[in-house]
């Protein structure tokens, strides 16, 4: 990274970031019936912000770097958004610092990100530069591990495709009557036009051996549970989103994991309110389908878990051959640079 400052920080931050009021947790990409769905372009919504794109192999410290930078600013009371890896919730794919208009993202597969305007909108940081070339003696082993990892992801996507088909079937079985729910909600919420309108599309849930939700990690002023049918909930969310967009009300759409064209929840950012889908049904066929969906997502999650374990093995190989002293220096330099950057 060019023009690195000489000033250093001693990073002794303990990385515990759950349930802090100034931190929000999301997924920017998820494993779905359509493969990996990538909404990383929704991380940094600042007009003149900058995004640092991390490159480098597994085990080179990308997630740890982001955790340390994020916690440095979070422990100073600043708002920080953490974007978790949908295949390993304990790992990060990105962070966003709205006060500074800065994002740091993992730009490696499956969410490959390249600079569109280098040194203007994005800066590339290649942590792969600090991998010792002795790692090459493990080339065949790494290649075989990556092949097996890919097979498990392909299996996971097959199960998710089946689960998504049944999810869509339940959409057709649901009652579409919203009974003026949207109008009543809008009257009770009294939403105001935002001074700086922003819209994002992200995810709050992902598939593992069970459906993982980040809902409990976030602190909201209020959470409303929408308990109409699956179909009716989606209609209400679409109407709320349309109203928010037309009236320049900042909001975050949190999409469904089994069909990302539908909305699972909507967050109204200015008042820190979340409206979340808790669908109910008495339809016997829909209930039966849901049981099958649960089995299919479990099967998908079991393959994602196997892929994650393989990924950990690959990480261990690279960890042995990575110079983390250099990466610590980069982390400290980034903090120094970000402190001077203010969102415009």
Task: Give, region by region, the residue ranges found by the protein language model.
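Phosphate-binding P-loop
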Residues: 42-48, 214-221
